[in-house]
């Protein structure tokens, strides 16, 4: 089968690789000059299935109000003048209940754990290298309230049989020796030993090369203007003056997926702006050995070979990609507070990207009401974590195979009204 994939981020490239491995003739189209040059370029570097959780959580609405008055707040909201933003935020608020949180986190952990398994198999099969580490993730708590609040997440981990360790301040140095100097600032930590790390952009670039070796064609620097429709199906992709035709089409355009298929269905994927800095390591003993997540600031600090990646925060501000100095200050403050002297933040590069987020946090992977149109988008802050599993899952669906995990509740149909022939999602 001929398959066209729109988008060459980590999710699009993973989809291409697994489809090609299944025997399909695959073409990837992207407006950029190469793979992983937008959202996948400089993310936090975590592959953290156990920490897969929606931003829509109990208590978040009240926290959001409090964060409005904090200098280093992890969340910021500025109205972008669109009705869609208001609809999306309303839908997100409706998911901030304990019941919805448990359902959504369960879906996310299921896909993320499967994706980690797919990544490990890929690594074993191909030997792909991407400055990866398998030292686990350590979530750090600065208050007793945060430590107590981890109970709801631990319950989900236990249900999913995800191994974990609850560490006291004195025990944190077992996972991250450099934290011994700052353990007095912390009340404890939750460690997931099965989590991994790696440079997402490097991985995507090397996976694209592997996909090419399987026959995948990459068309970079190519405009993606519209989908051509005929007889209720997709008939091609309009790329400038050319129409590219296939049997099946995959939209993996991240935050741009919503507007691209708005004439067919209203997919609730909104850009969640995040930031990162990447600093050179200057003192090995003071640097992290794997990755930590600061629960207070929602910031991840990840070790690459000779670099530290610090990323996080969320701004609901539309497609604004302006680099804000205050956000860099927050990232530098966090890493220098936990790992003082480990990296030289004065020499760090500064980046921002738009994560494609759904109101419930769960990505949209699978079929649509249009028979030959598939989606692989909406992974939010977990595109790297979920990429391989999402790619394999989509390849199975397109190939007519039974997926290895439950997939029905990951499709766009969960957002569609229960009306025959209806292709527009319900926001209320």
UniProtKB/Swiss-Prot annotation:
Cofactor section: FAD
InterPro entries in UniProt: DadA, FAD-dep_OxRdtase, FAD/NAD-bd_sf
Binding site for FAD: 3-17
SUPFAM superfamilies to which the protein is assigned, alphabetical: FAD-linked reductases, C-terminal domain, FAD/NAD(P)-binding domain
Family to which the UniProt record says this protein belongs: Belongs to the DadA oxidoreductase family.
Pathway, per record: Amino-acid degradation; D-alanine degradation; NH(3) and pyruvate from D-alanine: step 1/1
Protein name, UniProt field: D-amino acid dehydrogenase
Gene Ontology molecular functions: D-amino-acid dehydrogenase activity
Flavoprotein is among the record's keywords: yes
GO cellular component: cytoplasm; plasma membrane
Known function: Oxidative deamination of D-amino acids.
One Pfam family of this chain: DAO
EC number: 1.4.99.-
UniProt entry keywords in alphabetical sequence: FAD, Flavoprotein, Oxidoreductase
Single GO BP term: D-alanine catabolic process
Keyword Ion transport: no
Reaction it catalyzes: a D-alpha-amino acid + A + H2O = a 2-oxocarboxylate + AH2 + NH4(+)
NCBIfam families, per database record: PRK00711.1
Broad class of enzyme this protein falls into: oxidoreductase
